[in-house]
Amino acid sequence: MPDGTVNTGIGASVKRIEDQRFLTGKGNYTDDINRPDQTYAYMLRSPHAHAKIITIDSSAAQASEGVVAIFTGEDMQVGGLPCGWQIHSEDGSPMHEPPHPALAQGKVRHVGDQVAVVIATSLDHAKNAAGKINVEYEVLSPVMDMKVAEAGAPFVHEDIETNKCYDWGLGDKDAVDKALADSAHVTEIDIVNNRLIPNAMEPRAAIAEFNEATSEYTVYTTSQNPHVIRLLMGAFVLSLPEHKLRVIAPDVGG
């Protein structure tokens, strides 16, 4: 490489300058940010993979120490969570995108689906109150894998009457079929691709505050793309113009 590479940075080793504060415990993550008189949210989640919500009784939780408010899906009829990546099927039709409310409405569709949120003066108070919420479920048959999902399984989202989000592929099916038909031997094997998830040091987190004087929100959250969060939250969740919502991404632990 020519001598100019070190000066331009192209082809040269780039020295990191941010490691010292992380190695010495001086990172600034979302959980490190605290605001005056802040409250805490704790989600009550479904233990079932597929079930109807019959009733939610939060009366005992409402009377619990430190509780500020309790919300369920009935309180969030507007402002769902949009899909950030749109895909079209091979025939050009858009993918099915059923509603994705912040809290389950009438039905849970996976273990851990959010059923209620408790707002309290401390995280311990919120957790304690959530344990007092009584949810009655009608458990439904779960859809556990893709093959079962197509074989007459119950619909996870009844309003779209299918368990297939989109039909998309690559390659030449006719050429593949011909190659298999002309082969001397054909071996078939079922391969299951396991679910993958990164084990980040920091889970999803957010802290937000509202300025009554300016009617503006500020959100601190774990994100590598705060501009997209501002766009989606403003347009689809909070129905706010972007200039009324400020999203700050501090250090991200994953």
What residues fall within each predicted segment?
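ATP-dependent carbohydrate kinase catalytic cores
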Residues: P36, P241-K244
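Acidic, glycine-rich active-site loops and adjacent beta-strand->loop/helix elements
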Residues: M76, S223-P226, D251-G253
